[in-house]
């Protein structure tokens, strides 16, 4: 899943 949107998959910080 492309972490384009700051979710909780790869982008824990979010933004």
Swiss-Prot record:
This is Glucan endo-1,3-beta-glucosidase 1. Its EC number is 3.2.1.39. Keywords: Glycosidase, Hydrolase. It comes from the Eukaryota. Belongs to the glycosyl hydrolase 64 family. One of its GO terms (molecular function) is glucan endo-1,3-beta-D-glucosidase activity. It comes from Papiliotrema laurentii. It catalyses: Hydrolysis of (1->3)-beta-D-glucosidic linkages in (1->3)-beta-D-glucans. The keyword Hydrolase applies. It is an enzyme of class 3 (hydrolase). The lineage of its organism: Eukaryota, Fungi, Dikarya, Basidiomycota, Agaricomycotina.
